[in-house]
């Protein structure tokens, strides 16, 4: 079986590498699927993130048509505050707006991971509660000026400078980074990939 990561995210690549525990025989390739990430009318955040992960895995599988027995991992992460999905910021003003909204509050990070093979697609959903400290305008301005939040759901990266804003988490740290390790290992194990 040939493992493929349907993502070009350096964070997901690094996390998937960790799953191999340094074994030389654990390897994977990457593809960049292109899907429409527009939420459907009335779609709940849990349903949305699971749908996107599955669609990414299936789109990645379609890109592997010449490969022998591909197994494709797709993943998607969203930040949810008061039932609103906070995606990647469209610009610096949007990033600042999102960070102000998160300031001093708890929000949920949802990451879904899907494994698609020729005959089936399996999906796991992981949710982690993240609590932010109160952020000053100066903190927000400096963080956005670093450009770190610009490609991240919820406008922050817990594994980088944005970790300074995290007061506590309840749940999976790797979920917040973008690929829940325990659940991904379970999916791979069930597919016979070790």
Curated annotation (Swiss-Prot):
Superkingdom of origin organism: Bacteria
Keyword Cytoplasm (UniProt): yes
Transmembrane segments: none
Gene Ontology CC, one term: cytoplasm
Record site feature (Important for substrate specificity), residues: 11, 77, 159
Keywords noted in UniProt: Cytoplasm, Hydrolase, Nucleotide metabolism
Cofactor(s) of this protein: a divalent metal cation
GO molecular function list: dTTP diphosphatase activity; UTP diphosphatase activity
Active-site residues, Swiss-Prot/TrEMBL: 76
Broad EC category: hydrolase
Keyword Hydrolase found: yes
Enzyme Commission code(s) on record: 3.6.1.9
Major subcellular site: cytoplasm
Entries under CDD domains matching the protein: Maf
GO BP: nucleotide metabolic process
Localization per record: Cytoplasm
Ranges in coiled-coil conformation: none
InterPro entries: ITPase-like_fam (IPR029001), Maf-like (IPR003697)
Catalyses which reaction(s): dTTP + H2O = dTMP + diphosphate + H(+); UTP + H2O = UMP + diphosphate + H(+)
NCBIfam families xref list: maf (TIGR00172)
Similarity comment text for this entry: Belongs to the Maf family. YhdE subfamily.
Purpose: Nucleoside triphosphate pyrophosphatase that hydrolyzes dTTP and UTP. May have a dual role in cell division arrest and in preventing the incorporation of modified nucleotides into cellular nucleic acids.
Record protein name field: dTTP/UTP pyrophosphatase
Organism: Shewanella sp. (strain MR-7)
Taxonomy of the source species: Bacteria, Pseudomonadati, Pseudomonadota, Gammaproteobacteria, Alteromonadales
């Amino acid at each position: 079986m040939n493992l493929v990561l349907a993502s070009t995210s350096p964070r997901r690549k690094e996390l998937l590498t960790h799953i191999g525990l340094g074994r030389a025989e654990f390897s994977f390739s990457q593809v960049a699927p292109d899907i429409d990430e527009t939420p459907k009318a009335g779609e709940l955040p849990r349903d949305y993130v699971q749908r996107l992960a599955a669609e990414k895995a299936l789109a990645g599988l379609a890109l592997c048509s010449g490969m022998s027995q591909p197994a494709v991992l797709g993943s998607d992460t969203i930040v949810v505050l008061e039932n609103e999905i906070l995606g990647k910021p469209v610009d610096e003003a949007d990033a600042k707006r999102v960070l102000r909204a998160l300031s001093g509050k708890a929000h949920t990070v949802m990451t879904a991971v899907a494994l698609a093979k020729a005959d089936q697609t399996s999906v796991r959903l992981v949710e982690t509660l993240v609590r932010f400290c109160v952020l000053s305008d100066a903190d927000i301005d400096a963080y956005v000026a670093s450009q770190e939040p610009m490609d991240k759901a919820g406008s922050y990266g817990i594994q980088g400078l944005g970790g300074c804003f995290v007061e506590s988490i309840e749940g999976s740290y790797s979920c917040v980074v973008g690929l829940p390790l325990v659940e991904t290992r379970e999916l791979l194990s069930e597919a016979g990939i070790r």
